[in-house]
Amino acid sequence: PHPPPPTLFRSYGFDFGLWTRAIVRELIFQKFAIQLSITSVGSLLAELNLTPQKPLQRAYQRDPQAVERWQRETYPALVSRAKREKAEIYFWDESGFRADAVHGKTWAERGKTPVVERPGQRQGVSAASAVNAKGAFWFATYQGGLTGELFVALLKGLMYRRKKPLHLVVDGLPAHKNKVVKDYVASTEGRLTLHFLPGYAPDLNPDELVWSHAKRTGVARNPLHKGEKLEERVYNQLQAIADDPKLVRSFFKHPSVAYISD
């Protein structure tokens, strides 16, 4: 189930979006004048088949109608167009990696928060990738932030020796809409077309799941050895993903991207 909208919390006088046992207890008291212990509230929530979970964050600016329109109208029309043109559809995204990033959880003695020692040299690298539902995966690593010029260079790498026309789904990052990008896309004479996802809806992009997998199973699980370069590690990990079409296809089975078809 989707989390209640912020207005629901605020209508009860709460200015945040986390249902804790204490908040539920207070709400029960407000509505029914019944005072329960924290333990009793926890038992009640468990009986309702509710569990404590780390929520996904979703921007307030998200437009549900635009999301639904993308899923029900825009994307199906894109699929039909690609079939007529004998073209391929890929989803594109960028992400950053850091050697000192901590993902996931670790076991430790109760009551003593573990400390992860970070390397003195904080290596960082960025990566871009494109993924399609049939299991194909393209990627590149780079340094620094994304500019229009760099995006064009990456697109040229993606298009190199590509025989079929390509429809590329991207987000609304300013670099993706730069004039130099528009000029390059126009120069391909229909070989490359960009399509923009609704704003504040990264969950519609299966490439986000690639990054989640890469970060969860990469340096976070196997820290860099002394002298090892992060960029080389990230490159090898992304290459392993590219070599595993079955894994790539699995990203498209996530409920958030179930609207995507071949």
Show which residues each predicted segment covers.
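A short, amphipathic alpha-helix used for macromolecular contacts
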Residues: F9-I38, K83-E85
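Major-groove recognition helix of helix-turn-helix-like DNA-binding domains
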Residues: S37-L48
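Short Lys/Arg-enriched helix C-cap and helix-to-coil transition segments
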Residues: P52-E68
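RNase H-like polynucleotidyl transferase catalytic core
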Residues: L56, T113-Q121, A186-P206, N222-P223
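C-terminal anion-handling pockets and recognition modules
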Residues: E85-I89, D207-D262
